[in-house]
Every structure is written in C-alpha cells, then in structure tokens.
Amino acid sequence: MEDSGNSSGSEASRSGSEERRPVRERLGSRPPERRPVRARLGAIRRRRGGRGGRAARQALRQRRRQQQQQQRQQQHQRRRQEADRPDGGPDAPPDRLSESARAAVSATHARVGATRVNELFASARHDLSRPVFNDGFRAAGSSPWAAVLEFGAEQFTPDGRRVTWETLMFHGADLHRLFEVRPHATEAARVLREMVLLNEGLTESLASADETLTWVKLILTKGLTLRTLDPIVATAGAVLQNLRLKLGPFLRCYLRDTPVDELVRRRRLRDVRCIVTYTLVMLARIARVVERGSSCVLPEDLGDSPVPLEEYVPGACLGGIMDALDSHKTGCDAPTCRLTCSYTLVPVYMHGKYFYCNHLF
C-alpha cells in the first residue's frame, strides 16, 4: 500500500514538473511523430532558416510560376504559328492537291458550257414559279397582309409597303397568327427571306434591320410570343451578316476601340455607344437566341428594361447609320475614309475590276 502511494505521488510530481517545463522543451522531448502538426511545421521552418527561409521559398515559387506562365505562352504562340501555316506544321505531310481533286477541277470545262448554263437558269426559274404548295399562307381577301404574303406576285418597294406604327399595332397580330398556323408557307418564307436579305444593298439591309427590330418591339409590346420560327425573327442573323459585310470597311475605322467581331461576339449592352453599335448588338442578341435552338425570344434576352426596346424608334437604323457614315466621313483623319464612306452610301462602280477571262462559255 505504501509503495502504491509513493508511486502515485512520484507520477504526480513528474506531471507537475512536466507542466512547469517550457513548451518547446516539452514538445522537443516527444518523438517527432507524436508532436502536434503546428509544432512539427515550426521545427521544419526553424531548420530551413525561419522567416528568411520562408521569403526565399516564396520568391522561388514566384519564379517557378513565372517560368511556367512563360512556357505556356510560348507553347500557345508556337501552336498558333503552326496553325497559321498552310501545311499545318513542320511535321505535317506536304500540302498538295490530290489527284482526284485535280481531275475534278480539270473536268469542269468538259461539263459546263453555254447550253448547261442556260439549262440551269431555266430550271431555277421553274422551281421558283411554285415555291410552296397548299396555296401558301391563304390569307383572307380582306386581310391587309394578303398582297404581301403572295409568293412572287410583285416586286418589293419600300414605299409600297410603308405602314405606320399605329397600323402595325392594329393589324400585326394577324400576321403573327398566319406565321403560326401556316407552317409550310412559313418554312418557305424563312428560306426565301434569308436569300433576299443576303443579296440586299446597304439601304435595303438597313431597312431590313428596322423591320426586324420594329417587329420584335411590336410583338413584345402586345404581349405575344416572339417565336424563333417566325420568318422575321429567324432571319435576324442574315440581316446582321449582310450589314457586317456592307459596313465592314467603314466599321474597321469607326469601331477602333471595340472591333465589330468582338462587339457581336460579346453582345453586351454596355458596349452600345450609338445607333450603329445598338443595331449590331440587338441583332446579335436575337440571332443568338435563334442559333441556340430556343423556341422563343424572351424580353430579358434583349435587356432588363420593363418596356422592350423602349428607346428604339422605327427607322432609326436606316436614318441613324446613314447619318453616322456621313459624320465619320467629314470628321475622320484617315485619307481613305472619305472614299470608303461615300462608296458605302452610293455603291456605283468606279474602279477595281481589271479583266474577265472565261474559256468555258
């Protein structure tokens, strides 16, 4: 009994003396694997040189990150250079025409001649004589849209189709309904409208941009569904494509801060600075909804305004962009901009084509 009392007393004495020892000595007396994590890390830091060693390690890590970043940039630049080469890179096989490609190109002159050209034009005219079956849209004779919904009945003239905003608000729902209940005619209308839009001149293309934005504003204002199968909505991308082509030389100088490719790709409302950028961004936002396969364009696809396209006035695309061309022509320092803007507005041939050589017909 006395021995057990003495042993318990000695253990208490040792534990008390252990607690009175400095923390570093107590931890140092334990095996490394039994020390707390913080103590082990502290010991490692002390062995590596304390705070000075930590700064050196941070500098080393920073140098390694910089080296890795430089290597990634060099690899990216090397890949871009290889992609820009016609042969695809130093290890790619020689870039040359295959024998079948040579034969196909050489055989063109034996297959195509004056007779063949006349035949294909006649065939195309025949196909366009009946572009749609089931009598097209079959609009009632009393409908204000009956004449314009005919296929190939008459040539389009802007003044012949001019309507007021009030007239559109009154009769627009009827056209919207016909686009929905005549799917076969609507499909043909989408195809033909796209072909027409891609072949328009600048003035006609700007009027088509106004037609698109006016229609979108009308449908959303009336609370109707803006379907992406609607011929006017579905072809917003064609309007945008043709405008970028017709305005391309002007836009390269006019949009120096934000190139048109970047402007259209980002489609950000905060990039809008004028009617030119407004038209491009709005058409791009509509076209994007169509491209991703959505069934309809929602008001929030065009912005967070409680009134869709509240700031847009029908005709702003045509009038505003023509005014921007003239203003840029008189204000730009580039010596060629005067010619560029003038020809964009009035595309009459003056110079540029030098010969025409045709051994086929």
Curated annotation (Swiss-Prot):
Q: Name one GO cellular component term.
A: host cell cytoplasm
Which residue stretches does the UniProt record annotate as biased composition, category Low complexity? Answer: 1-15
Q: Which family does it belong to?
A: Belongs to the HHV-1 ICP27 protein family.
In this chain, the stretch annotated as RGG-box covers 45-54
Q: What is this protein called?
A: mRNA export factor ICP27 homolog
Please note every region of biased composition (Basic and acidic residues).
16-36, 80-99
The entry describes its oligomerization and partners as: Homodimer. Homodimerization is required for transactivation. Associates in a complex with RNA, and host export factors NXF1/TAP and ALYREF; these interactions allow nuclear export of viral transcripts. Interacts with three host shuttling SR proteins SRSF1, SRSF3 and SRSF7. Interacts with host SRPK1. Interacts with IE62; this interaction enhances IE62 transactivation.
Domain statement:
Binds viral intronless RNAs and SR proteins through the Arg-rich region.
UniProt-recorded Gene Ontology molecular function terms:
RNA binding; zinc ion binding
Binding of Zn(2+): at which residues? C253, H328, C332, C337
The source's domain of life comes to Viruses
Cellular localisation: Host cytoplasm; Host nucleus
Q: State where the CHC2-type zinc fingers lie.
A: 253-337
A single Gene Ontology biological process assigned to it is:
regulation of DNA-templated transcription
Any Pfam family hit = Herpes_UL69
